[in-house]
């Protein structure tokens, strides 16, 4: 940084809105067996220049509610990331998941829920910035939503 320049503070929410999508996608995970039980825990990361990660976690109800819970950490080190994945893995058997599949699973569940008038949880408003925008630039993968073709609470 040049002399006499101060580093400006940017809030975590502002960082997510303005910077997160400029970073490369990192590893993504989902709980094994999500197709059978109607809920998925999806983790999406982006890699910061420092090597730390932007971490987004989404609880996705594929039967009805879409994104039930979401949160982000805008600057997570490797130790905390491994710890988070290990904790999830001990309960949910997490497996690596290609980003394009994570993207389609989350946005598809949101679209399905919105057809029933259900919006994503409030925290999705900022956690969503760990995802790419839902555009034609991301190949479309169709998943089945609902239980036996119907909304299921």
Residue ranges and their predicted role:
Residues 2-153:
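Non-catalytic terminal/accessory regions
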């Amino acid at each position: 940084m040049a002399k006499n320049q101060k580093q400006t503070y940017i809030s975590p929410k502002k960082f997510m809105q303005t910077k997160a999508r400029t970073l490369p996608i990192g590893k993504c995970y989902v709980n094994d067996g999500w197709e059978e039980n109607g809920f998925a825990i999806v983790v999406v990361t982006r890699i910061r220049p420092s090597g730390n990660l932007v971490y987004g976690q989404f609880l996705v109800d594929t039967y009805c509610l879409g994104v039930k819970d979401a949160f982000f950490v805008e600057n997570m080190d490797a130790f905390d990331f491994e710890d988070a994945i290990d904790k999830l893995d001990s309960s949910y058997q997490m497996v690596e998941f290609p980003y394009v599949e994570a993207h389609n699973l989350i946005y598809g569940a949101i679209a399905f829920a919105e057809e029933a008038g259900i919006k994503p949880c409030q925290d999705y408003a900022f956690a969503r910035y760990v995802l790419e925008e839902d555009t034609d630039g991301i190949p479309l993968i169709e998943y089945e939503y609902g239980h036996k073709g119907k909304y299921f609470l």
